Design a protein with these regions (language model features):
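Shared catalytic-loop signature of beta/alpha-barrel
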Residues: 1-71, 75
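C-terminal extensions of enzymes
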Residues: 59-99
Length: 99
């Protein structure tokens, strides 16, 4: 989780090692990664995967963060600054894991 990555990053910083958060998921992971990266003095680069530009990803959340001129604007909204759209939740496939 976010707290564990922060701990690992702090240890890496003590040894002058840079950090790049692997972020190849949904728009929510982009928000979480951006907020985390803002706290890391040893942050190097943000990974923005092409899956975050696909229609299936763009339609998942209220806000669609994309870089502009190579930079992101980190939202100052509550939490990680984004939320799933109810329509995306309604069309999600449900799986029953345990009887």
């Amino acid at each position: 989780g976010i707290t564990e990555v922060k701990k690992i990053s702090d240890m890496a910083h003590a040894y002058d090692v840079g950090i790049q958060v692997h972020c190849a998921g949904s728009p929510l992971t982009t928000n979480a990664a951006l907020h985390l990266e803002c706290t890391l003095p040893n942050f190097l680069i943000h990974e923005h995967h092409t899956c975050n530009r696909m229609d299936t990803s763009v339609g998942l959340t209220k806000y669609n963060l994309q870089p502009e001129n190579g930079y992101f604007t980190v939202p100052d909204l509550p939490g990680i600054g984004n939320e799933f759209l109810q329509e995306a939740i309604d069309r999600a496939t449900l799986y029953k894991v345990i009887e």
